[in-house]
Structures are given as structure tokens and as C-alpha cells.
Curated annotation (Swiss-Prot):
One of its GO terms (biological process) is glycolytic process. HAMAP family: ApgM_A. Keywords: Glycolysis, Isomerase. The keyword Isomerase applies. Its EC number is 5.4.2.12. This is 2,3-bisphosphoglycerate-independent phosphoglycerate mutase. It comes from Aeropyrum pernix (strain ATCC 700893 / DSM 11879 / JCM 9820 / NBRC 100138 / K1). GO terms for molecular function: metal ion binding; phosphoglycerate mutase activity. PANTHER family: COFACTOR-INDEPENDENT PHOSPHOGLYCERATE MUTASE, METALLOENZYME DOMAIN-CONTAINING PROTEIN. It holds the Pfam family PhosphMutase.
Length: 424
């Protein structure tokens, strides 16, 4: 049995939202899957928790994040292709604009105007930076736009990830960072969060990297050229969410489920999760391309991947961003675009290839347009295959709230539930 596991990023709204995207959007291709399907709701993490995307994605792929989550930094590093060693720490990072004299932050994301090419050039200027009088090293990779990942390594001493962020907009709480409503707009030097030599050393190395990066980047040719064009300089790097390698590597996806899996994802952290659990990473170029073109290629690659894999996981971007913007109409358009440009060609290609896979369709989290942020609400879940008796009709919150699957606590239960259902 082949399985297509399709996640609509942030497509769900809250059951209490006055209007719901999945109910009002015209999505005949998605809804056609409901003719042989069962449905329900799922808390991808747990009730009342507004999931972070990486935590939810790991859960959806069958791994309880409370047991297997290594931290955002390492997942970003895996996705960027950095081979971490025991004792390294990794942090997610982004280029920012600061006053180099006072370290006052002018823009945390360089006005979202930094191209990936510019970011790669700037990253090369700080990658391999020597720290601690040559005893330490910083590895830095640009990923997408203003985003990047930083790995700190010491030659002879282990580093601890128990350190605070240099990004003042996020406060470290346990393994996560939470966005602060108010903060002082200055680079915040890192501090150890425990009384431990490894944490003291890690914080010191992060601070050294952060300050040296401002000196190097402020006068970099890329930034001088941007300044001449009236654009903000990308002259600082803000870091958060430090993490180290887990004590034990998780069982691979094939070991866990007996399935050969592949993923088609866009974000570096999602790619990192795929590599972390041993999914084959199928790349689709997104930079400089229309969203509709990307969807069509993702559909084509998904069908190709089914020829050689048992399960293909596809994480589709689109609805989450207008949800954050509070745009109901934007979420409607995003879901309709997915239906027209991904699901329609996908179903055509499957028919032409004579393939009849099972479908799992859900969201990684709700991003209710009337809230403008991720919420702790459950999201709709549909499992579809020609062998399933019964029809659900429209795929939506209202229908799935009454569904046969009930409410599942934990996205990591979806794959076992699907396999059990398909086994009869």
C-alpha cells in the first residue's frame, strides 16, 4: 500500500472562528477524496498548546516530540547540511540591521529584502570564524532569505546548549523560545542558564561571534552596495534556540514503521527533520518561482516518488502566512490555489500512472485568521482510500468534528492509525 501524506500548512482555523477557510474555499479535488474516507480531529502536539512548526512536523511524522525533539538549532543544522559533532551546539539565526556603534536593532530581518545570493556571500565572510584564540570555530550557513544557522565548536571542550538568546525578541524557556510583546531593541549578549563551565564557554563564544560578525559585515562589499541602493545593511546576526546532538539517534522511519519514506518540503527545518529520521529528501527549487509552478512540480515529484517509496510526505506552504496576516480572503485563495495547482494535477498524474494510493490530509497546526497566530486548536484529519467504506463529503472542521476517528491526541499517532485502518 502506497501512502501520500499531505500537510496544508496552517490551513485550519479554530472551531470558534466566525468563518472557516476549509468550509468556504472551493476545493473540489480535495473534497473528492472524501468519497471513500474517514475523518476526525487531531491535536498535533497536545490540547491547548499552540504548536511550533518543527515540533508539530516531527509529531506528524510519527515521533513523539517530547521524546525525540533535539531542539530547533540542530534541526536547522541538519537541514543546512552541517555535520554536527558531539559537544557542538547549533542555533537558528537571522541577519539583521543594527547601528554598529550602539548595537541598536533597526530591523530584525533586514526589511525582508536580503536575497539568498547576498546572504550566501555574507555568510561566507563569517563562516569558519576563529573564536577563543583559535580553540573554537563558528560554522555559519545562509539558508533562505535572511535566515541562517550557526554551529559553535570547540577543539577540546564540550559546549552546553543551556544559554540565552542574542535575539532580544525571543526569550528562552526550556527547549523553546517565546516571542516577547515588548523588548529593548538591542543585541542581547548571551548568558549561561546553568552554573556550568560548558554553558559559560558556549555563551562566551556566541558573544564573541556576534560582536565580530558586526565588525566584519558592516563594511562588507555586499552591504556597501546595498547602502548605495538605499537598502538596509545586513550587518548583524541574531541567534536563538541553541541545541546539541541528542544522546541517542532516533530509530529511522523505516525501522519504526517498516516503510521507505520520502519528503517534499520547502523549509530548511523541515528538511532537517526529514534527515533526522531518515526520509529521502526530494528537492524542489522554490526561489524566484511562482507558487503555482512550485505546486505543480511538487505534485509531479510526489507521483514519481511513489514509484520507489511506500510513503511520501508533502508539506505545502501557502495558507499559514495570510492566517498570520489576519486575511480570511488570503487563506481562501491559498487553499484554492493548492486544490487547483497541486491536487488537480496530482490526481491526473496518479490516474495516468494507474496508482491508487491512500491519502492522509491534515494541517500541522491551526492559524486562525481571526487570531493571527498559531492556536492550540485541533485540526481536521482525513484518511482516504478506495477500500474505505463511507463518505465524509467536504473536508472541513465542522465535518471532521463529527468524524469516525474522533479526536486524536498527538500527531505521532496518525501513521499507526492509518496503517491499522488500511490493514482492515
Amino acid at each position: 500500500m502506497k501512502i501520500l501524506y499531505i500537510v496544508l500548512d496552517g490551513a485550519a482555523d479554530s472551531p470558534t472562528s466566525p468563518r472557516k477557510t476549509l468550509e468556504e474555499a472551493s476545493k473540489p479535488n480535495i473534497d473528492s477524496l472524501g468519497s471513500h474516507a474517514v475523518c476526525g480531529m487531531v491535536y498535533t502536539v497536545k490540547p491547548g498548546v499552540a504548536p511550533q512548526s518543527d515540533y508539530a512536523t516531527l509529531s506528524l511524522l510519527g515521533y513523539n516530540p517530547d521524546e525525540y525533539y533535539p531542539g530547533r538549532g540542530p534541526l536547522e543544522a541538519f537541514g543546512a547540511g552541517i555535520e554536527m559533532r558531539r559537544g557542538d551546539i547549533a542555533l537558528r539565526a537571522n541577519f539583521a540591521t543594527v547601528d554598529p556603534g550602539t548595537l541598536r536593532i533597526i530591523d530584525r530581518r533586514v526589511g525582508r529584502s536580503l536575497t539568498s545570493r547576498e546572504a550566501r556571500e555574507l555568510a561566507s565572510a563569517v563562516d569558519g570564524m576563529e573564536l577563543e584564540d583559535g580553540e573554537g570555530t563558528a560554522l555559519f550557513r545562509a539558508t533562505i532569505g535572511h535566515r541562517g544557522v550557526l554551529v559553535l565548536r570547540h577543539r577540546s571542550k564540550p559546549l552546553s546548549d543551556a544559554i540565552s538568546n542574542t535575539d532580544p525578541a525571543y526569550e528562552r524557556r526550556g527547549r523553546f523560545s517565546v516571542a516577547l510583546e515588548k523588548y529593548e531593541p538591542f543585541i542581547k549578549l548571551s548568558n549561561p542558564l546553568v552554573e556550568d563551565e560548558a554553558a559559560v564557554l558556549a555563551a562566551r563564544m556566541l558573544n564573541e561571534f556576534t560582536l565580530k560578525a558586526v565588525e566584519i559585515l558592516d563594511s562588507h562589499p555586499v552591504n556597501l552596495a546595498r547602502e548605495k541602493r538605499g537598502l538596509l545593511k545586513a550587518n548583524a546576526i541574531l541567534s536563538r534556540d541553541a541545541g546539541g546532538l541528542p544522546e541517542e539517534k532516533p530509530p529511522s522511519f523505516q525501522e519504526r514503521f517498516g516503510l521507505r519514506g520520502a519528503s517534499i518540503v520547502e523549509m530548511v527545518v523541515e528538511r532537517g527533520i526529514s534527515r533526522y529520521i531518515g526520509l529521502d529528501d526530494i528537492r524542489v527549487e522554490i526561489e524566484g518561482r511562482a507558487r503555482e509552478e512550485v505546486y505543480r512540480e511538487e505534485a509531479a515529484r510526489a507521483v514519481e516518488a511513489l514509484e520507489t517509496h511506500d510513503l511520501v510526505y508533502v508539506h505545502l506552504k501557502g495558507p499559514d502566512e495570510p492566517g498570520h496576516d489576519g486575511s480570511f480572503e488570503g487563506k481562501i485563495r491559498a487553499v484554492e490555489d493548492i486544490d487547483k495547482h497541486f491536487f488537480a494535477p496530482l490526481l491526473d498524474r496518479l490516474s495516468s500512472a494507474g496508482l491508487e494510493p491512500a491519502f492522509v490530509v491534515t494541517s500541522d497546526h491551526a492559524t486562525p485568521w481571526d487570531v493571527g497566530a498559531h492556536s492550540g486548536d485541533p485540526v481536521p484529519l482525513m484518511i482516504s482510500h478506495q477500500s474505505i467504506q463511507g463518505s465524509i463529503g467536504k473536508f472541513s472542521e465542522t465535518v471532521c468534528l463529527r468524524g469516525r476517528l474522533g479526536t486524536i491526541i498527538g500527531g505521532y499517532r496518525i501513521i499507526p492509525k492509518t496503517l491499522s485502518l488500511l490493514a482492515g
